[in-house]
């Protein structure tokens, strides 16, 4: 059941992206519930800024706000051209990709850019070309019928390896 009435009132503030040694970049995230959950998960792991492609859902969408459970007021979401961002930062780029190496076999640094694509389309081909290391979360065994993990779940698993 959807809530009735106002969910939250936000004063939309424009922030300046801080220079960090670690960035989460989201490519084409269209599901508001996923973006809200990602914002909440990022806050849990101490990440206070996220970069989204310009074709991602608006972070002030009511479903994003609801799913973020208040984290949107503490995690800043920026919209940018991802290719330009990657070129500007000149950092090692990881990409969550079903065809990548097992994340538990990859030496993952606590720095760089992590790119996550939408569940339905993955990371855009032009961005895939910029990725230095594709990483996947393997199934526990090949008999598992589920095709993939939910995007926020994948992000949470990877962040737990990097940030804890």
Name every feature range the model reports, one short phrase each.
Residues 1-17:
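Extended, non-globular alpha-helical segments
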Residues 14-99:
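RNA substrate-binding interface of SAM-dependent RNA methyltransferases
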Residues 7-9, 24-25, 51, 114, ...:
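Conserved beta-strand segments that form the floor/walls of ligand-binding pockets within enzyme
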Residues 95-145:
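Active-site/ligand-binding-proximal alpha/beta "capping" segment
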Residues 6, 37, 71, 96, ...:
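Gly/Ser/Thr-rich helix-start
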Residues 8, 43-45, 59-73, 125-164:
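Structured adenosyl-cofactor binding patch, chiefly the S-adenosyl-L-methionine
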Residues 1-2, 89-94, 108, 150:
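Short, surface-exposed amphipathic charged segments that create phosphate/polyanion-binding patches used
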Residues 5-9, 68, 111-117:
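Short basic, glycine-rich beta-strand/loop surfaces that mediate nucleic-acid
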């Amino acid at each position: 059941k959807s809530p009735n009435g106002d969910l939250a009132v936000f004063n939309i503030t424009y922030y300046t992206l801080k220079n960090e040694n670690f960035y989460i970049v989201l490519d084409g995230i269209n599901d508001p519930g996923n973006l809200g959950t990602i914002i909440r998960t990022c806050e849990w792991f101490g990440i206070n800024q996220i970069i989204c492609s310009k074709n991602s859902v608006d972070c002030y969408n009511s479903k994003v706000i609801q799913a973020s459970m208040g984290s949107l007021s503490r995690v800043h979401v920026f919209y940018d051209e991802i290719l330009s961002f990657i070129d500007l930062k000149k950092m090692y780029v990881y990409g969550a990709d079903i065809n990548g190496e097992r994340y538990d076999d990859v030496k993952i640094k606590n720095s760089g850019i992590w790119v996550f694509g939408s569940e339905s389309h993955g990371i855009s081909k032009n961005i895939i070309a910029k990725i230095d290391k594709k990483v996947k979360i393997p199934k526990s065994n090949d008999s598992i019928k589920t095709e993939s993990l939910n995007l926020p779940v994948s992000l949470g698993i990877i962040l737990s390896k990097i940030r804890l």
